[in-house]
């Protein structure tokens, strides 16, 4: 059994850190890093001039691994275990919030966390190490429910075929490891051409999102940031796949009154106050230098908004284009 606190292979490189710091410059005051992970963004913000950073993570391992270096920042660094959708309970009047979505490199590199289809490990995928694991979902969901998860959360076109194969295989023997599940999925799909992603990529993404409630957490986090930021405060979000980016894009469009009129024949609606101004008009991706240094950045996109003094308002899952399982629609 691998030591659960062993350091991941290779240094952690925060994605899009340089363009993020450029977009939010000058960095001053108190910031919250809602996805602390290995501390890459937190270190970058502190080095850029933040007076204090509150590092939030649901994974207790993140703080165990930060112990060797966190103390050097003194009271400039505050660590808070929890979910970023509750950030407004941890702090108010923030000057900035950073969210780096999805699984962290630290979690991906530790085989025993069960996030990677490239390494043998228990089929876990829990970021907080609490609640049902991916193995539990694979064992307990019906074929229809599994297909719904794979299609809705992973945009997997072969979701029904894969779900059928999983149900067939689990009847023979429980599916409890990452490589066993990856092998089952590979058997359902054509061999990928050079440059194409691994056949299990979308299915593993879907299960991870379901296990951790990532879309609900993202929606809650965007709303919590709106409540926690002071006027002029900045919200920077880094996403890694199209669904996350679409949700963040829709949030900023909605809050900046940039959604447009869905029906050109309908009477114009009275413009509502804007909760955010767009800092990045379009999503910012990695440049060629970052791609060469960190291949994991290839799908990363950054969006940044600036908080106004307008009162926070609610938003629906539909308005955010948030995928929902059939049973919750």
Curated annotation (Swiss-Prot):
For this entry, list what GO says about its biological process: rRNA base methylation
Identify the EC number(s).
Answer: 2.1.1.199
Name the predominant localization.
cytoplasm
The family database entries (Gene3D superfamilies) matched by this protein are listed as: Putative methyltransferase TM0872, insert domain, Vaccinia Virus protein VP39
Q: Does the keyword Ion transport apply?
A: no
Alphabetically, the GO molecular function entries are: rRNA (cytosine-N4-)-methyltransferase activity
Which residue windows are coiled coil?
Answer: none
Judging by the UniProt lineage, the source's domain of life is Bacteria
Q: Which residues bind S-adenosyl-L-methionine?
A: 39-41, 57, 84, 100, 107
Q: Which UniProt keywords apply?
A: Cytoplasm, Methyltransferase, rRNA processing, S-adenosyl-L-methionine, Transferase
Similarity comment: family membership: Belongs to the methyltransferase superfamily. RsmH family.
Specify the protein name.
Ribosomal RNA small subunit methyltransferase H
- The coding gene here is rsmH
């Amino acid at each position: 059994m691998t030591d659960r606190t062993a350091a991941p292979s290779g240094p952690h490189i925060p994605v899009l850190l340089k363009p993020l710091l450029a977009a939010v410059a000058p960095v001053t005051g108190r910031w919250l890093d809602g996805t602390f992970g290995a501390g890459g963004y937190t270190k970058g913000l502190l080095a850029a001039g933040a007076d204090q950073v509150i590092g939030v993570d649901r994974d207790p391992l993140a703080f165990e691994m930060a112990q060797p270096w966190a103390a050097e920042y003194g009271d400039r660094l505050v660590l808070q275990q929890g979910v970023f959708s509750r950030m407004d309970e941890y702090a108010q009047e923030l000057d900035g919030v950073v969210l780096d979505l999805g699984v962290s490199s630290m979690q991906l590199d530790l085989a025993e966390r069960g996030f990677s289809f490239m390494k043998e490990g228990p089929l876990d995928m829990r970021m907080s190490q609490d609640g049902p694991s991916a193995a539990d979902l694979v064992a307990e969901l019906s074929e229809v429910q599994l297909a719904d998860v794979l299609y809705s959360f992973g945009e997997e076109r072969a979701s029904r075929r894969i779900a059928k194969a999983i149900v067939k295989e689990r009847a023979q023997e429980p599916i409890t490891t990452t490589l066993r599940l990856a092998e089952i999925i590979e058997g359902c799909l054509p061999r990928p051409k050079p440059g194409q992603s691994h056949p299990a990529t979308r299915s593993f993404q879907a299960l991870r999102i379901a296990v951790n409630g990532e879309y609900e957490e993202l929606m809650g986090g965007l709303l919590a940031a709106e409540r926690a930021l002071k006027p002029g405060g900045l919200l920077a979000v880094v996403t890694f796949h199209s669904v996350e980016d679409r949700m963040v894009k829709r949030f900023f469009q909605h809050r900046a009154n940039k959604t447009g009129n869905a029906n050109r024949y309908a009477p114009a609606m009275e413009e509502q106050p804007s909760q955010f101004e767009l800092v990045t008009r379009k999503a910012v991706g990695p440049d060629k230098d970052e791609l060469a240094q960190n291949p994991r950045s290839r799908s990363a996109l950054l969006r940044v908004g600036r908080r106004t003094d307008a009162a926070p308002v609610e938003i629906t899952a539909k308005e955010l284009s948030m995928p929902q399982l059939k049973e919750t629609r």
